[in-house]
Amino acid sequence: ILVMIEGKAEINAAGQKWGILGDRMDVFEKKPPHSIYVPNGQKWSLNAKTDCVVAVCSAPGKSGHPARKIEPNGIKLIKRGSGSNTRYIHNIAMEDEDYCDSLLVTEVFTPDGYWSSYPSHRHDEDDFPNITYLEETYYHRINPKNGFGMQRIYHCLLYTSPSPRDQLQ
């Protein structure tokens, strides 16, 4: 899935010309992005028309799904969580779409001083809707530029003994 984070670009994918896509010049405008689903093994190209940032999101998937444009007008900014775990989500590609067989794509906007990706969760079993088996990758952008973020990754097997540090050695 190609996601136009910022800027405008002409995109060709899977033998189709998708035209010039991109409607936001800064990700923090919080407008939904233009995106293209590119099937496994299909070629794509991009010709930037302005300065642009594009997320190339991929994971091994099942075949047979046609290329498609994921329109911004079908993506809403949704509030998720509460209190200091409140965040705002653009669901770009989710489980309810047939082509999302091994990859979900979201944009998360987290207010200053709040937490995201909490409570702790995993994606190592296929037991939908409780747990989904898929890849998870994070790409962080910070606003203001001199701000910072913190991310902690854990593996549940590390927390089965009294001393997780012993498991790391």
Annotate the PLM regions:
Residues Y159-D166:
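Conserved small/polar residues in nucleotide/adenosyl-binding loops
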Residues V27-G64:
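Ligand-binding loop in jelly-roll beta-barrel domains
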Residues H34, L104-T106, E136:
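A generic structural signal for short beta-strands and their flanking turns/coil linkers
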Residues Q169:
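Nucleotide/phosphate-binding catalytic cleft detector across ATP-hydrolyzing
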Residues L2-Q42:
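Long, hydrophobic/aromatic-enriched structural stretches that serve as scaffold segments
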